[in-house]
């Protein structure tokens, strides 16, 4: 069996469906997980889907992916704008990385328009709500090693 695609979500994404639904939509993180699993299955892939509000835990999972994953999808949420540590972990992992955002950061507040994660990402998918994750999984499957 081939290695899975890791799909990692950062802080506050556990609140999807209730937190600012006018920006992030009404689907829950569990809904997003099911969409990703279905897309991966249709592509002959599996995923490992995780969320954490803790930077260190996300870094641990990124480092774990180095040996256990074929590609990585990450929605860093707020950490995208602040975490050089996550950037460094992504650069060290040696895997294709697809950055994913539910909203379009370029169309939001100035501080959201740049992410450190983009410096390590092979590509970025944003602005399509929960479908951003599906598209990111599809891209990661195409890039997988």
Curated annotation (Swiss-Prot):
Keyword entries, A-Z: Amino-acid biosynthesis, Aromatic amino acid biosynthesis, Lyase
A Pfam family matched in the record: DHquinase_II
Top EC group: lyase
Site positions per UniProt: Transition state stabilizer: 19
Cross-referenced CDD domains: DHQase_II (cd00466)
Keyword Amino-acid biosynthesis: yes
Record: residues binding substrate: 75, 81, 88, 102-103, 112
GO molecular function, one term: 3-dehydroquinate dehydratase activity
Enzyme Commission number(s) of this protein: 4.2.1.10
UniProt-annotated catalytic positions: 24, 101
Keyword Chloroplast: no
Pathway(s) this gene product operates in, as recorded in its UniProt entry: Metabolic intermediate biosynthesis; chorismate biosynthesis; chorismate from D-erythrose 4-phosphate and phosphoenolpyruvate: step 3/7
Transmembrane segments: none
Gene Ontology biological-process entries: amino acid biosynthetic process; aromatic amino acid family biosynthetic process; chorismate biosynthetic process; quinate catabolic process
Domain of life: Bacteria
Catalytic activity: 3-dehydroquinate = 3-dehydroshikimate + H2O
Role this protein plays: Catalyzes a trans-dehydration via an enolate intermediate.
Family: Belongs to the type-II 3-dehydroquinase family.
Subunit structure: Homododecamer.
NCBIfam families according to UniProt: aroQ, PRK05395.1-2, PRK05395.1-3, PRK05395.1-4
Protein name per its UniProtKB record: 3-dehydroquinate dehydratase
Organism: Phenylobacterium zucineum (strain HLK1)
Lineage: Bacteria, Pseudomonadati, Pseudomonadota, Alphaproteobacteria, Caulobacterales
Gene: aroQ
